[in-house]
C-alpha cells in the first residue's frame, strides 16, 4: 500500500511521506486521507476555474482543453488506496469506517466534476457493506513488475548522493502529466537550465513536458494567476486522527503566492504538526500544552513556593495567587457588583455573590434534588445523606458536618462568651445566639409560614413547622419503622428500644427516659411534702 501511495504522489509529497516512515496500516490511512483531500480540492478548483472564466473565447478554449485533459487523467484510481486482506485486518473498526466514508466521498466528488464515468468495484463493495480488500496482485490494477520498477527508481534516487533540491527538480511524476491542474505547476519546476537541457529530449520521448527554470515558472505562474481569480490556500486546523497525525480541514480560496501551492500546503501541514507538541508530568502523567504550565504544575510535587509576600512573608507557588493575597494588605477590592455596589477581592467571590441577585443555583443534589448557589454548600449537604461528620472536637470527640459548627462548639470548652445582651446582660458564645435571644425582648418574629401565616423568631422553627403542612417525617426508627417530624421526638423514641434513662430523681433516685416524665414524678414529691406540712 505504501509503495502504491508513493507512486501516485509528486516528489515533494513522496519525500514528505518517506521521512515519516509510516509502518502500521493505521498510519498509512491517516497519511492517505490527508493527501486525498488535497486531490479533491484541486479537482474542484479546476471546475471553479471553468465556471468563472466565461468572458473571452480564447480563455474558454484554453480552459476547455485543460478540463478535458484533467478529466482524462485524474480518475478514481489516482485518489484511492486499496488494502490486502492482512492490512485490512489490522485496521480498527473506526479506521475502517473512516476509510469507507472518505472513499465514497472521493468518488462522489469526482463524479460531480465529471472526472469519473464508471463505478469502480471497490465502491460497489463499500456500498453493499462488503470488505473491500483485494488480493496482493490486484491492488489498484498495477502489475507487480511495473510497481516494483517505479518504486525502485525512486528508492534508488533517495539512496544516492543527490541533494533534496536536485531530487525535487529532477524527478517527474509519471502518472500526472500536462493538463493536471494540481501537478502541472509542479512538473514545470527545475533547478536550472542545465538540468533542463540534459533531460529535455528524454522526457519529450515519454510524452512528458520538459522541466523549466524557476524564473520561467514564475513568469508563467503570474500569467496563470491573471486567468484564474481564485486559488487554493490551505488553512490548517489540527484535528487529532487515529494515530495523532494532523489532518486538514476547511480549505478556502485566496490569491496565490509565489511558491508552489502544494509546497505551501506541506509547510502549513508541518507547522500544524509542530503545534501538537505537548508536555507531560513524569510524576502524575498530566499533560499540558505549554511548558510554562508544566513548570507551574511541578511545584505542586516539589512544594516550591518562590513567590513570597513582602508584608507577612506568606509564600505561594504561583504569582497569580500572590496578587489576590496582596489585596488583603492594600484593602483593594477591584471587583464590584453592578446590582448593589458591593466589592470583592476575587472574581470568584463576585460570581458567587451575583447568584444572590439572579437566584441561580447550579449545584444540585442528585439524591433529593436540592440546589445550591455554591459548590461548598452542596458538599456540606451531601454529608447529611451519608451521615459523614469529618470535623471532630479534640476535647470531647463530638463530630460535625461543617467546620464552622466545630468552631462554635469549641467555644463551649474554652468558656468564652464575648457577646452580651444589653437588656438582661446575658452572655453568649456566638453572635447568632445573641441575635436570636434579643428577639425575645423585642418580640420580633421575621419568619412567617406561607400556608397558615404563623410567625417564628428562628428559621429552624419555621422549617420544623412546615413539616406539619407537607407531612414530611424525615426521622425514621430503624427498629420499628416509626417516623417523626422532630429529631427530639426521634431521640426520645429511641430510648424505648435501648432502655436508656438519663434523667434521675434527686429524691428517690428513680430514673426516666424523658425529662417530662421526671418533672411529673418530682411533683409527687412536692405534693407529699406539702401534705406532711399541713
UniProtKB/Swiss-Prot annotation:
The molecular function terms of the Gene Ontology recorded here are:
DNA-binding transcription factor activity, RNA polymerase II-specific; RNA polymerase II transcription regulatory region sequence-specific DNA binding; zinc ion binding
What is a single cellular component term in the Gene Ontology annotation? Answer: nucleus
The KRAB domain is annotated at 74-145
Give the position of the cross-link Glycyl lysine isopeptide (Lys-Gly) (interchain with G-Cter in SUMO2).
Answer: 37, 40, 178, 235
Q: Which GO terms describe its biological process?
A: Golgi organization; regulation of transcription by RNA polymerase II
Expression induction: Up-regulated by Golgi stress-inducing agent nigericin.
Recorded hits in Pfam families, A to Z, give:
KRAB, zf-C2H2, zf-H2C2_2
Which UniProt keyword terms apply here?
DNA-binding, Isopeptide bond, Metal-binding, Nucleus, Repeat, Transcription, Transcription regulation, Ubl conjugation, Zinc, Zinc-finger
**Which parts of this protein are zinc fingers (C2H2-type)?**
279-301, 307-329, 335-357, 363-385, 391-413, 419-441, 447-469, 475-497, 503-525
Q: What is this protein called?
A: Zinc finger protein 69 homolog B
- Name the gene that codes for it: ZFP69B
